[in-house]
Regions:
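Surface-exposed, low-complexity/disordered segments
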Residues: 5-9, 29, 64-69, 78-343, ...
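Short, solvent-exposed loop/turn positions at domain surfaces
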Residues: 2, 46, 131, 380-382
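Structural motif
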Residues: 3, 40, 216, 372-373
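Beta-strand signatures of extracellular beta-sandwich domains
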Residues: 35-39, 158-160, 211-213, 369-371, ...
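Short amphipathic, basic-aromatic surface patches that mediate peripheral association
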Residues: 19-26, 199
């Protein structure tokens, strides 16, 4: 595990990189998800799921404002690692300072520089393996960092540049050798995150149709696989970040059941944690706290996500952009007026949508699978009565599709402008909740001041972490810009050498 720094303020962002391999635990390298926890001896304070590609991934965790000052344990593991005892999971200590409130839980010892010299913390000296092009920079000025080519064979090289305004003594915990766990066996998450949910009830039928759908402009719908009495697993793939999900469980006779999602985290609480020994200046922490409050008030940059229109690897046979047509009040009116290749039949008191079979030149005997923002609705009458002004696209997927034990004669997918099923009433057998999927390599945002107009902008830039690169493999240098926060900055390059030893080199520069 690698973090951007060792000491944080409550409310700051923590950037963490996780790497797994097969050396210690054969088979662990197949994992596509890692779990990160930040705990004290009382409770879990923050958690995150990390998406892994080729055994590596990273995440950004916002530390809660309520965290007390003290030392915390940061631990990481995969689902497959739960076959071994928890004391073998990688762990490290991090320091957190809460400058806005004092708590009885605070475990903080403020030291002077003499105590730190005795404790083994010394000032960083010039390192020929990592050098900046200058020793002193101005505000919003370009910085060039270079390092020796001797590290070209190193693995998992990570670079961070942070303001040096707080020194802490951080003793690292010892990790035990892996010992097998007795009991339940845990399979690796080879394709993606496995969501586990339990059906609530005393007398459950032997067979239930359980589904998990992600609300959005893409189709992410999964059928639950029964693993034990009332316990179902949903094997997701490619779903990342926070999503609104819809869970449903229904018996063959139509009876609805409630489901609860089970936490995938172990909740590794340490028995003891050392007190936090810290050296800092009040003025530096006040400036850092003000910078944190400004950063939280500023809107964050969000990169647009490319939408995937394929369903089961198939592109839409026909797409209707409703913004290009005369607006009607209901979806049924749109279907009748201009959507071709579909028909509306009646089955008792319910309306059923069927799609055209091109090979047979007739409408399919099986009903269509109707989706609204990725969520399946089996009562087609409700969809047909939906406000068409909310809908942007209607996608048709012709052919035959199987979902669990059910067959469908095509898919009709309605995508709304907002992608969140606005004003759509969910059925009694559905539950909607927010769920955090693994983070997919979040981007560290930093401004570039090469343009004089941007450099002269009055928009504040109080970045405490100037630069964070979870992977600088194959590079021999980077460029970035300083912020409006003056002080001493420390660059740290970390990694693993070819023979498996830890690499860590540092250098310092001033910003005035």
């Amino acid at each position: 595990m690698y973090t951007d720094k060792e000491c944080y303020l409550a409310g700051e962002e923590l950037w963490v990189k996780v790497s797994v391999d097969d050396e210690a635990l054969p088979g662990n390298g197949l994992s596509r998800v890692a779990y990160v926890e930040i705990c004290d001896t009382a409770q879990v304070r923050a958690q995150a799921k990390v998406s892994l590609t080729d055994g590596t991934g990273w995440a950004c965790i916002r530390l809660p404002q309520t965290m007390h000052s003290g030392m915390y344990q940061l631990s990481a593991y995969t689902r497959y690692m739960r076959n071994w005892k928890a004391d073998s999971y990688p762990r490290k200590h991090i320091a957190v300072l809460n400058v806005r409130s004092v708590s009885d839980e605070d475990k903080l010892v403020r030291n002077d520089s003499t105590a730190f010299q005795k404790g083994g913390v010394a000032a960083a000296s010039a390192n020929p393996n990592l050098m900046s092009d200058k020793k002193v920079y101005g505000l919003r000025e370009k910085v060039s960092l270079e390092w020796t080519s001797a590290w070209e064979d190193a693995k998992e090289l990570t670079l961070s540049v942070v303001r040096k305004d707080c020194e802490v003594l951080v003793p690292q915990p010892e990790t035990a050798s892996p010992e097998p766990n007795q009991g339940e066996r845990w399979v690796a998450e080879c394709e993606g995150h496995i969501v586990t949910a339990r059906v609530i009830g005393d007398q459950l039928p032997a067979s239930l149709l359980t589904q998990l759908s992600c609300v959005g402009k893409e189709m992410n719908m999964y059928e639950g696989k029964k693993k034990a009495e009332g316990l179902y697993r949903f094997y997701t793939h490619g779903v990342t970040d926070q999503q609104d999900i819809v869970l449903s469980a229904q018996s063959n006779d139509g009876k609805a059941f409630r489901m609860e999602v089970e936490s995938p985290f172990v909740e590794l609480l340490p028995n003891t944690l050392p007190a936090l020994h810290c050296l800092y200046q009040d003025s530096a922490l006040i400036a850092r706290s003000v910078a944190l409050q400004l950063a939280q008030a500023m809107p964050k940059a969000v990169l647009p996500k490319k939408l995937e229109e394929k369903i089961y690897g198939q592109l839409p046979s026909k797409t209707y952009n409703l913004d290009e047509y005369v607006r009607f009040n209901t979806v049924e009116e749109c279907m009748v007026e201009f959507v071709m290749g579909t028909t509306i039949d009646r089955k008792g008191n319910q309306k059923v949508i069927r799609m055209l079979q091109e090979d047979a030149k007739d409408f399919n005997l099986f009903p269509a699978l109707v989706l609204v923002d990725g969520v399946a609705f089996y009562n087609h009458s409700e969809v047909l009565a939906y406000n068409a002004r909310q809908v942007q696209y209607i996608h048709q997927y012709r052919g035959s599709f199987a979902l669990g034990e059910m067959f469908y004669g095509g898919i009709l997918s309605l995508i709304t402008h907002r992608g969140s099923m606005p004003d759509m009433r969910i059925n009694d057998d559905m539950q909607m909740l927010a769920y955090e999927f693994p983070q997919e390599r979040p981007v560290f945002h930093m401004p570039a001041y090469g343009n004089p107009e941007i450099k002269a902008s009055r928009k504040p830039d109080f970045r405490h972490t100037l630069y964070w690169a979870p992977s600088v493999q194959g590079q021999e240098g980077v460029e970035f810009y300083t912020s409006d926060l003056a002080g001493t900055y420390e660059a740290t390059l970390q990694g693993i050498s070819e023979d498996g030893k830890k690499i860590e080199v540092k250098c310092e520069f001033e910003v005035r």
